[in-house]
A protein has these predicted regions:
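Conserved acidic donor-binding segment of nucleotide-sugar-dependent glycosyltransferases
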Residues: 120-128, 136-141
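A short hydrophobic beta-strand element within the catalytic core of glycosyltransferases
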Residues: 19, 80-81
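Aromatic "clamp/platform" in nucleotide-sugar-dependent glycosyltransferases that forms part
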Residues: 85
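Short alpha-helical donor nucleotide-sugar binding micro-motif in glycosyltransferases
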Residues: 64-65, 72-77, 168
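Short hydrophobic beta-strand element within catalytic cores of glycosyltransferases
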Residues: 102-105
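Conserved donor-binding/catalytic core segment of Leloir-type glycosyltransferases
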Residues: 1-14, 19-24, 34
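A short, well-ordered alpha-helix in the C-terminal region of glycosyltransferases
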Residues: 143-158
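Nucleotide-activated donor-binding/catalytic signature segment of Leloir-type glycosyltransferases, i.e.
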Residues: 46-68
């Protein structure tokens, strides 16, 4: 597993620029950063990201990916990175968890709700902290590999539609009973 993965819309709230800066600061010669996503509304922001990354041969922009290509990227990455400032329940984070990936995530409530006791937490909008977490994953992978299993288990217990529907039905039954 030789790369970190960012997957999502390339917009400022999701902070791909902080991730690029942090990855370059981490300076891991044997690792890459794959940026999978696009922004058709603000192409100038994508151009800014490409300019930011142009000094590094280790940062790859794929554009938007779908279906099997998305799965292939998620299956093979060392860690999924979600450095967002503002986020609802991120579908890409749930997808990364369902592939059993370690997740480097900003410590915002939505990410904490999804990951629970898992996750390599970074302070949002803190390039130095994010860089340290990128290095931490590369150098301590064996110590945190348990998170892969935990993330799969958490997805099955909390985010599979059948489970969610059963929990919701139980909740409604309790309300009606009271």
């Amino acid at each position: 597993k030789s790369y970190y993965l960012y997957m999502g819309r390339l917009v400022q709230d999701k902070n791909p620029d902080y991730l690029i800066k942090a990855f370059m600061q981490a300076n891991l010669a044997d690792k890459k950063l794959v940026i999978a996503g696009s922004n058709d509304v603000m192409p100038e922001y994508v151009q800014y990201l490409r300019e930011l990354a142009k000094e590094s041969k280790s940062i790859i922009f794929t554009g938007a990916v779908y279906d099997r290509d998305k799965d292939k990227l998620l299956e093979a990455c060392l860690a999924f990175c979600i450095p967002s400032t503002i986020e609802g329940l991120s579908i890409t984070l749930l997808e990364a968890m369902s592939h059993g990936r370690i997740c480097i995530a900003s410590d915002i409530p939505a990410n904490k709700e999804a990951l629970g006791d898992s996750g390599v937490w970074c302070k949002y909008e803190d390039v130095d902290d994010l860089a340290s977490k990128i290095i931490f994953v590369a150098t301590n992978y064996d110590k945190i590999a348990w998170q892969e299993y935990y993330n799969l288990k958490r997805i099955k217990e909390r985010f599979i539609w059948r489970t969610v529907a059963e929990q919701y039905a139980s909740y409604l039954h309790r309300i009606v009973a009271n």
